[in-house]
Amino acid sequence: MSTSLAVVRLDPGLPLPSRAHDGDAGVDLYSVEDVKLAPGQRALVRTGLAVAIPFGMVGLIHPRSGLAVRVGLSIVNSPGTVDAGYRGEIKVALINLDPVEPLVVHRGDRIAQLLVQRVELVELVEVSSFDEAGLAETSRGDGGHGSSGGHASL
């Protein structure tokens, strides 16, 4: 099943986003500008692209795994969210996680990937307690942040 995504190329000098391989979930996003990131530095980098995410869907901006492994480039708010109502340019909050080496992003570099997924638009219903609402206890309860174990043997 395929859904169309309307895109506006704000910088005609850059290619349209594309998948590296058939069946890949994400399309690559390109940098419009040259940016130098010192270790630990972050920057909001323009992509030269605007999209019209269909209602009931969301765009998620993920890091490119190869860049994360090779040079420590990641996204501060990973994944970034592009809501269906947003019509501005997609920008990516990049960060250089390398503790020593600066990193240079050049115009035209593939810096992130955009995934578009369906999203459930839930209606919030306030209840006084989960018990009163008939929502049974679970084996997990309120356990989080390491409650499933494994943290001692990383």
UniProtKB/Swiss-Prot annotation:
It is an enzyme of class 3 (hydrolase). Keywords: Hydrolase, Magnesium, Metal-binding, Nucleotide metabolism. Its cofactor is Mg(2+). GO terms for biological process: dUMP biosynthetic process; dUTP catabolic process. It catalyses: dUTP + H2O = dUMP + diphosphate + H(+). GO terms for molecular function: dUTP diphosphatase activity; magnesium ion binding. Substrate binds at R64, S65, G66, N77, T81, V82, D83, K91. InterPro entries: dUTPase (IPR008181), dUTPase-like (IPR029054), dUTPase-like_sf (IPR036157), dUTPase_trimeric (IPR033704). Pathway: Pyrimidine metabolism; dUMP biosynthesis; dUMP from dCTP (dUTP route): step 2/2. Its EC number is 3.6.1.23. Belongs to the dUTPase family. Each trimer binds three substrate molecules. The ligands are bound between subunits, and for each substrate molecule, residues from adjacent subunits contribute to the binding interactions. This enzyme is involved in nucleotide metabolism: it produces dUMP, the immediate precursor of thymidine nucleotides and it decreases the intracellular concentration of dUTP so that uracil cannot be incorporated into DNA. Homotrimer. This is Deoxyuridine 5'-triphosphate nucleotidohydrolase. It comes from Mycobacterium leprae (strain TN). The gene is dut.
